[in-house]
A protein has these predicted regions:
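GHKL/Bergerat-fold ATPase module
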Residues: 1-214
Length: 214
C-alpha cells in the first residue's frame, strides 16, 4: 500500500483505539512495543523477555489513561454530547491469557468508576454525575422491549411518562442512549430501573391516576 502522506509514527508503532478496542479514545505512543493485534494488549506469561515488553505496554496505557482522565476532569463542563463518547464495549473474555483478561477487567472498571463520578449528564440547567444524584435510567430488559418500531414507540412513551412521575430522568430524547451507556459500564448498576420498580413506586404514590398505572 502507498503510505505517502501518513505520519511514520502511525505506521511503525501500534495504535490503540480502533472500533474493536472498547472505548472512544485513541491511545497512541511511540513507547508502545508493537503487538500482533493493534486493537489491544496481550500479556503472555510464558516468556519472561517478551512479558517485560508487554508489561511496559500496560504501564504506558495506564499513564495515558491518567492523562485523558485529567483532561476530562478539567473540561467536563465544556465537553458536549458525553453520551456519544462515554460508552464502553471491552470484550474482556476473548483473550486467551488470564492475566490479560484480568487487566482489561480492571481497566474497564477504572473507566466505569471514573465516568460514574464525572459531572457529564445534562439535567435541567446543570451537569450532574450519576453517583452523586438520584437520576435513573431504563434497564436493558426495558430497552429490549422498545425494538418493535410501532409498538415499541407507544410503549416507550407510556413507560417514560410513568417513570418520570416518581423518578429523576434525563430528557426523553436521550434516555435510551444514556441507558445503554450506563449498562455498558455495569448492567446491574443501581440507577437502572425495571418495570417492577417503576410500578412499585407508582403504586405507593398518592394522586396517581389509573391510566398512569395501567
Amino acid at each position: 500500500k502507498n503510505l505517502s502522506g501518513i505520519a511514520k509514527l502511525f505506521v511503525y508503532f501500534p495504535l490503540l483505539g480502533t472500533e474493536n478496542f472498547g472505548m472512544d479514545v485513541i491511545f497512541h505512543s511511540k513507547k508502545f512495543f508493537p503487538v500482533e493485534e493493534r486493537n489491544g494488549l496481550h500479556l503472555p506469561v510464558s516468556n519472561a523477555n517478551v512479558r517485560s515488553k508487554y508489561e511496559q505496554n500496560t504501564q504506558v496505557l495506564d499513564s495515558l489513561t491518567e492523562m485523558v482522565q485529567q483532561y476530562y476532569r478539567e473540561h467536563a463542563e465544556n465537553i458536549t454530547n458525553w453520551v456519544n463518547i462515554s460508552g464502553l464495549s471491552f470484550d474482556c473474555e476473548h483473550h486467551k491469557e488470564d492475566v490479560t483478561k484480568d487487566y482489561f477487567r480492571t481497566f474497564k472498571k477504572k473507566w466505569s468508576n471514573f465516568f460514574q463520578n464525572l459531572p457529564m449528564v445534562d439535567f435541567g440547567d446543570r451537569r450532574i454525575s450519576i453517583t452523586e444524584s438520584d437520576i435513573r435510567f431504563f434497564s436493558q430488559e426495558i430497552i429490549s422491549d422498545f425494538t418493535d418500531e410501532k409498538a415499541g414507540e407507544v410503549y416507550f412513551e407510556a413507560l417514560y411518562d410513568a417513570a418520570i412521575v416518581t423518578n429523576s430522568m434525563v430528557a426523553r430524547s436521550e434516555i435510551i442512549a444514556w441507558s445503554n451507556v450506563v449498562a455498558s459500564w455495569d448492567e446491574l448498576h443501581p440507577s437502572l430501573i425495571g418495570v417492577e420498580e417503576i410500578a412499585k413506586k407508582l403504586g405507593a404514590c398518592d394522586n396517581v391516576s389509573k391510566s398512569t398505572l395501567y
